[in-house]
Curated annotation (Swiss-Prot):
Residues 1-230 are annotated as: Pyrophosphorylase. The lineage of its organism: Bacteria, Pseudomonadati, Pseudomonadota, Alphaproteobacteria, Hyphomicrobiales. Mg(2+) binds at residues 106, 228. One of its GO terms (biological process) is UDP-N-acetylglucosamine biosynthetic process. Homotrimer. The active site is at residue 347. Catalyzes the last two sequential reactions in the de novo biosynthetic pathway for UDP-N-acetylglucosamine (UDP-GlcNAc). The C-terminal domain catalyzes the transfer of acetyl group from acetyl coenzyme A to glucosamine-1-phosphate (GlcN-1-P) to produce N-acetylglucosamine-1-phosphate (GlcNAc-1-P), which is converted into UDP-GlcNAc by the transfer of uridine 5-monophosphate (from uridine 5-triphosphate), a reaction catalyzed by the N-terminal domain. It comes from Bartonella henselae (strain ATCC 49882 / DSM 28221 / CCUG 30454 / Houston 1). Its EC number is 2.7.7.23, 2.3.1.157. One of its GO terms (cellular component) is cytoplasm. UDP-N-acetyl-alpha-D-glucosamine binds at residues 9-12, 23, 76, 81-82, 142, 156, 171, 228, 317, 335, 350, 361. This is Bifunctional protein GlmU.
Amino acid sequence: MRSCLSIVLAAGEGTRMKSSLPKVLHKIAGLPLICHVIKQIELAGVSQLAVVVGFGAKDVVHVVESFVKNAMIFEQKERLGTAHAVLSARLALQKGVDDVLIVFGDTPLIEQDSLLQLRAQLAGGADVVVAGFRAFNPTGYGRLLEKNGKLIAIIEEKDASDEEKKLSFCNGGILALNGKYALSLLEKIGNNNSKREYYLTDIVSIASQEGLDVRVVEVPFDNIIGVNNCFELFEADSLWQKRKARDLMLSGVTILKPETVYFSYDTQIKPGVMIEPNVYFGLGVKVHSGAVIHAFSYLEGAVVGTDARIGPYARLRPGTELAGSVKIGNFCEVKKAKIGKASKINHLSYIGDAEIGAQVNIGAGTITCNYDGFHKHKIMIGDHAFIGSNSALVSPLMIGDGSYIASGSVITEDVPMNSIALGRARQVTKKDYAMKLRARLSANQQKK
């Protein structure tokens, strides 16, 4: 197994984002850009990770160290170009590895297959490998200049001749180096340019002039898309969502209108699930086979059991665990609750901090009153209980198996199993009084 060091460049401020948040910490699918990159790097078998930080270093380091263990952190104190940024990780380079993989922290759509292709070229004898792509409109991209089938230089557009600007094979920004030559090549890069910066792209011409084996690997354009402003963030997120929906549908998930469904990076959906339009999956959602997620539902931090039915217009909040065949209907909210098999909460209810047994029916308009202004309290409802409509269940509370709560009740005391509880005032009916009431109200109206 070849050893590999990956250096992730994450020092840029990203002024075009017009945000105080470092660019690499903006999110797609609920995960920071840099974490998407690191995830693919790990899948590509990288053994060592170095991250070069700069603007917002403290925040970037916190996110990286929370996401991955044993990352080496280096700070680029001056912004003197991409090669200078890579050399900020000199100590990591000096350790010596077979492969050095250099990627940017703002390219969240890179896939492990592309990284593995670059590494395969190194294993096959290459010394420098560049990721390239074919651009329909190459404006703004560096061009890859080849001679006799060999890559000899990367020409930035501002330096390109009219003939070179016609080239459509462009620099994708990802670079792989033979660890034997990586440090020496980087140290030979100069700053003889208008900006007095050290450009990483110069490494290609230096390596070519030294007779080293320089190659290019063509990768899909969407793999190397960088994020520089909020519109590009939206575009990257849209492409990620399309990939996720495609993968799910190919695995056996039915998505009726995929362009209206939003997934998070960790969303898990088993084959046989059906998802209707306009559904949002926040972080930490797992949906088991046979479940149906109806339109306009919002799920986060929830587990949905086999053959469950959610929505339409339902909200599942963190800590929700639904067993098989549970039904959560329209305009219901469930938070931090375990709900047993085949139980139903069909209409207009709030259930929070609860443990509900199997085959329980929760009537329309029922709410758990779980917060006293200082603390949350728990309610437990046993199997086969029936909760009538428009009931208020004041926690802490225990309702036993098979118990029946009359509609409109306010329940403040525990209810033993197989009991009936009524918590409302007795109805008073005055026969024929409606006519007298109307006459009195009418007379009062005429006096005005």
